[in-house]
Structure formats: structure tokens, C-alpha cells
Amino acid sequence: MAFEDQRTTVYKIDPAHPGSETLPTLRTEELLLNMGPQHPATHGVLKVILELEGERLVKSTPVLGYLHRGVEKLAEDGTYHQFIPHTDRLDYVCAMYNNFAYCRAVEKLMNITVPDRAEYLRTIVAEVQRIIGHQFWLGTQALDIGAMTVFFYCFRDREILMDWFDELCGARLTTSWYRIGGVERDFTSSLLGKLKQFLDYFPPKIDEYKVFLETNRIWVGRTKGVAIISAEDAVSFGLSGPTLRGSGVDYDLRKAQTYSAYPKCEFSVPLGKNGDTYDRYWIRVQELYESVKIIRQCLEQMQDGPIMADVPSVTLPPKQRVFTNLESMIQQFKLFSQGFDAPRGEIYCGTEAHKGELGFYIVSTGGGKPYRLKIRAPSFIHMGAFDHMSRGYMISDAVTIFGTYDIVMGECDR
């Protein structure tokens, strides 16, 4: 199917002068339509006021804040360790990334070096979470557009990794497995065996997803040429992740500001050409292959060693020592109840989550609690481009365009 920008009716565009727009000779009365608020079961409550001319979108105004819980303010009232479970409730579809990004920010503030084995464990779990996130997006986006079969296939394979998370940390969604200075627990032989088995099982399943969608004329027709954004506009709006790389911008924090075990792994960063919904789908599928490649390399390179930095004034003691040693029990109690004494200063640390750049900005005036914590959530940033990317498309494209960002309102509203 040839590439074609589907914005053609509301404003007539002169091909010779694409920057100029003229009104059509026949204009209908504009209509305001409320899309949402939706039920919380749809991963967040969102209202978008759509301004229509016929069936074409003239303007889209997102109304945010229905899921605002004051998460950033809560950070000021608890210790640094106590805030980790709160991060689970941001993007609750992929909580591991929230834990990871927050812990990296605190470690940067405290100048803590994480042990090598812990870095490999973190990277493996982060890439497993990326696979889960992209499977969730692919299944629900396909379902919204009309390809129901892919939804069942994606969630079938996602369940394998959700059960793996359950065995790893006792939770499927709100995980709280990452710790400041390391991780909560190591992999067991059972977890390693199941993960290796999944790495052999999964790549052929990705091929199945592609066959189902790329040979589906409805899917191709509803994604190619829809929600186009240029590289310049994508950068101007502050987009990141697959949404930015779909426009051909080569920017991935795992490469640009590399961290954890990523410098020791070889992987590619897929880039789109047209900046449309189809390119963003293609990038996410390619990232599934790359995540498998990264996990394999980490498993091959990982050596035995500690999983927590040895900084008694900041990091938690091993749980077995807490049960058998009085000093370790007191250390854990004090770290959770009083916190550690952070230096004065401010830092920002960004992490490449599956949606885009997830960053934490922390201002410390000393003491055991942050003075201010600000979260840079990719979902919130991407919602700012919704009006720009939806103008001129059909009302039936609104759900497709909203889904192309992979937005979770818990992260957006906070």
C-alpha cells in the first residue's frame, strides 16, 4: 500500500505549497463532541473535547487531571525508600520502569555505584518489562482498530512474563522489586530456566503478530498515513521513545546517555521514515526482537556477585541478616522510618522506558526527605501533541491517534 497522508478534506492542501492551507468552498457547521471521560478500567479517565467539521477533526482539547492523586507531593512526606511503592502506581502497566527510573535518580543524588550483577539483573528485568509493555500496547491498539485476534495472541504470551514477575517478586503489576543501590532479590534457577525457555519461544510469536497485522488491509489502512508528525515537530513537542523515533529521530537514552548494563550489550535502535502510526507500530515490533537480544547477552555476561551496594547508611541490609542480626534489623527500621541524610543539591535522571523518557528531578535540602520531586512522564508530554497530530483526520481515527502514544493516565495525571 502506497504511503499517503490522509489529511485532505478539512483544509485543502496545495501539493506545491504544503505549508499553505485554504478553506474548502463548502463548509458545514462545527460540532463539539466529548470523547470520555472513560471508565478507569480502560487504563485511565480522560476527556477530549473534539471539534468537528463533518466527520473531520478540526481541534482536539484534552482535559486531564481526573486521575490526579498528588504523587509528587506524597514524595515530600516520606523517606526516599518509602516512595518506591508509590512509583508502581504511575504507569501501572509497567511498574518496573517506574521503580528503575526513581532508584537511578536517588543513586545519582547519593553518588552510589551499583554492583555489576545488580546492573545486569536490572537490565534484564527492564527489557522483560519492555516486552510486556509493547505486547500490551500491540494487543489493545489492534483491538481498538478491529484486529481482535492479535489481542488474544499478545496477552497469551504476556501472561507468561506476568507469571514470571509473580515468581520473581510476588506481584504481577505493582512490583517494587528495584531498590536504591540494587535489587530486592536475585534470580533463582527456576526463574533463569523459564526466562531462557521464553527467549526461545518468543521470536516466532513476534513473526505471527506481524503476519496477522501487516497482511490485514484494515490495520494497514487505519495506521498508514495517520497521525503524521515530522522530526522537527516531534523534537519541538518533546516527544520521546517510539513516538519520537517513528519520525526518524535517532535518540534512545540507552545509547545517548547509556547506563546500567546497556554499554556492554550490542543492539540496534529502529527508526521510522514517515512519522505515522504504522511506523510507530513497526518500531515497537522491532524493539521486541532487540529486547530478546539484550536479555540473551546479559544472561551470557552476568557473573556472580552482590546484588546490593554496600553503603550501610543508605542501602537496605540483606533480608536474611535482618531476620538473624539485631543491628541489621535496626538498620532497616531506621532507613524506612527516618530515612538517610541526603546531600543538598538537585539532580535530574532520565531512563528509557518503553513509552519514552521517564525522568525524575529531585531537589534536596538535606535530611531524609526530598524537598521537591518532579516526574517527567512521557504520557503527559505526548498528550500535548494530540491536537497537532489529530487535525484533519476522521473522527474514527481519534482512538487510533490516542493509542499511538501508548498513554496510561495514571502516569499522565499523577
Question: Which residue ranges define each predicted feature?
Answer:
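Metal/cofactor-centered catalytic core regions of large enzymes
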Residues: 1-414
